[in-house]
Amino acid sequence: AVTIEYVSSDCVGVNARNVFAASPSSNKVFSIEAANNNLWVVYGGYNLSFDPLNKKFGYSHYNGSSTESTLWVNKAYDPAFPAQDLVHITIDPSADNKAYLSSWGSGMMVVDQDEPVVIWDDSNSGLEDLYQDGEPESSIRVNGAAFDNRGNFWITNAWVPNKLKKLETNGNWKGFDLSSIITETVALGLTELAIDKTGSVWIGSRRNGALVYNESGDRKRALNTQGTSGSLPDLNVRTLAVDRNNRIWIGTLKGLVVFSDAESLFELDIYDAEPVIIDDNGVPKKLLGDQPVNSIAIDGAENKWFGTDTGGALGTNPSGSQTLYNFNKDNSPLPSNSILKIKVDNSTGKVYFATDKGIVAFNSEVAPYGDALGEVYAYPNPVKKEHEFSRTEFDLLFDDSGNFSPPEIVENKENEKRVEE
């Protein structure tokens, strides 16, 4: 049986067994993060030009392991901790109930036990303000962040000289100047950050491609649209993911590419990423074509998940050569084809899709860390475009009011599935 949970959407009328009354505070989601049966949600943002939206919506946290009666905690904007435009969540790898919330304007908010503890800004951390001292305005624009395997915390800090920051385990801050690999000096927005198996930090950008930094030797390189130096389909890099083979999956405004030699990146004269070529009824085509790719996630079995701007979500095998799932608003409970973010909780096998109309969770039944595959893979393989997915294969996390009344449900004795009356 599958639980359908309405959390933040304007969709109703879906087959369900159970429904959570509690939910996130809004269906206007900007980003999510998931791990160990915990889901975090933020609602801030920026526009396509990376201008702050000045949203003061706080954050939400679902703790599936909580013994409390309410599993969802919603925190409104707090003037005592005035972080607005929260755009990214980094869960502490050693504490599921501690998270670092990036703010596109206020720095970074540290949350522990669901309560804000401190906001890191230019007065108490290594983060920099894009405005100079003495100027009346302030804007500390932080986005992608991640912990490396040694516990160091890497953070993007846009529109300042040292665009990459590192908080070491001893509490020291370092800043790294990436200006030598920046070619577009006006559109300086930064997106996601990922760390590969060699310790290189990969950063997506609005118009500077993929920026790569390795602290060992202070090595820097950028992948752009030029042949021999990246061959990206577009300089707007929206998402990055690193798989177990240290391949870098790069989603751009105009499609997907993969860079397969991260270990040798700084020694290569030619360092081009390549599209994934699939067989479409005997015709070779690029996986996802020229679609904008907003998010890439990798599950415990190394399957790849792609969220597109207008085409819904796609799940593939580890190489990307075979489609396992093709979800859209017509064949699944997705409330929209605009996928903002995909995150996988490898402890539960759930794949979370944040759309512009709410959040959906799909039970992939991939065992933790890829130990086994569930019967979920009995779908048509490859998936046909017209294939419809049963709504009972999803958890739906929707509710734009926080007071959802579950639909009346009855048992269908013929197929032992719950159906809506």
Where are the regions a protein language model picked out?
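C-terminal outer-membrane/trafficking sorting elements
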Residues: 388, 395-421
